[in-house]
Amino acid sequence: MASFTKTVLIPIAHGTEPLEAVAMITVLRRGGADVTVASVETQVGVDACHGIKMVADTLLSDITDSVFDLIVLPGGLPGGETLKNCKSLENMVKKQDSDGRLNAAICCAPALALGTWGLLEGKKATGYPVFMEKLAATCATAVESRVQIDGRIVTSRGPGTTIEFSITLIEQLFGKEKADEVSSILLLRPNPGEEFTFTELNQTNWSFEDTPQILVPIAEESEEIEAIALVDILRRAKANVVIAAVGNSLEVEGSRKAKLVAEVLLDEVAEKSFDLIVLPGGLNGAQRFASCEKLVNMLRKQAEANKPYGGICASPAYVFEPNGLLKGKKATTHPVVSDKLSDKSHIEHRVVVDGNVITSRAPGTAMEFSLAIVEKFYGREKALQLGKATLV
């Protein structure tokens, strides 16, 4: 019996842009693709951009004879240069092209890799804004589309376009119905590229000394896009972000089996003070947060001190609501668990700030959520600059 599984290769390297890589991995897996994450380094662990550590499924050197329906390259520097200089990857991508199978790339990778390898000749392509001149020298027409399809090559621009890019790849592999299904779960922005906004009530200043100290806990089956968006964006803003694992291992497998590495165990920072504690979602991940007494106690102390705390996706419903952390507050959460909120007046809002509490809905709102935190700490101008730089 013929198999209808679609196989995808995503190579990663030291200096890969983690939000792009993680979004591609998780969105394509949501669509039903069999995704292999392969390190082009000599070990499966890679140090991605912004101090984020990822663990691949395998080494590229072990699978060079494998055939995939799609090979998709993330960006980031120096990761994009490393991918370009990987001869094994170049050979695989060129064979992919000559055999008429799909190739895709985002950010700097269209110019650095696909363009350098001669695969964009006669094609329309897009990429990260600062690479457009280089891209124009390697393709027929460099365009500013958020996602560009030309034949069997798909290109895109940067972190903020990655989910749209990945949805397009699902459509190429599985058809529009599956793409629309995944898109509706993720809650993509209705107006990508426009200035982000959020709903704010009971406005208060979020204070900090020198640099915001922010805790991002992660647990088994946490939603990876939400976790990495928070860390990626907040570190771009120069906040001091600590990734802490709930459990006994620093290595955590997210809800879509992407492997992330925390810097500390939550137990090691349970007595420390933070300017913000902010939780990613994921249904099972949020339930693990809710069952972690130390984390719940930290959140209660944060609330008692009137210090900011936040959550996205299932975390407001499963962690905040049952522990009284939304009492008197307007909040939002993922649509599938919104019935658990006692006050449902703001559940359709993408990001809600009520005094010292910030909540949001889903992977598709994670960058807006992160930028809203930047705005609360640093002001609107810096948040808009980051939004522009990441192409939200």
Swiss-Prot record:
Effect of disrupting the coding gene: No visible phenotype under normal growth conditions, but mutant plants have increased susceptibility to oxidative stress-induced cell death and accelerated cell death in aging plants.
Keyword field: Cytoplasm, Nucleus, Repeat, Stress response
Pfam families: DJ-1_PfpI
Localization of this protein: Cytoplasm, Cytosol; Nucleus
SUPFAM superfamilies cross-referenced by the UniProt entry: Class I glutamine amidotransferase-like (SSF52317)
One record GO biological process: positive regulation of cellular response to oxidative stress
Residues of the PfpI endopeptidase domain: 6-174, 212-378
GO cellular component, one term: plant-type vacuole
InterPro entries with a match to the protein in the record: Class_I_gatase-like (IPR029062), DJ-1 (IPR006287), DJ-1/PfpI (IPR002818), Prot/Nucl_acid_deglycase (IPR050325)
CDD domains: GATase1_DJ-1 (cd03135)
Function comment: Involved in oxidative stress response. Confers protection against diverse stresses by binding both CSD1 and GPX2 and mediating the cytosolic activation of the Cu-Zn-dependent superoxide dismutase activity of CSD1.
Subunit structure: Homodimer. Interacts with CSD1 and GPX2.
Protein name in UniProt: Protein DJ-1 homolog A
Origin organism lineage: Eukaryota, Viridiplantae, Streptophyta, Embryophyta, Tracheophyta
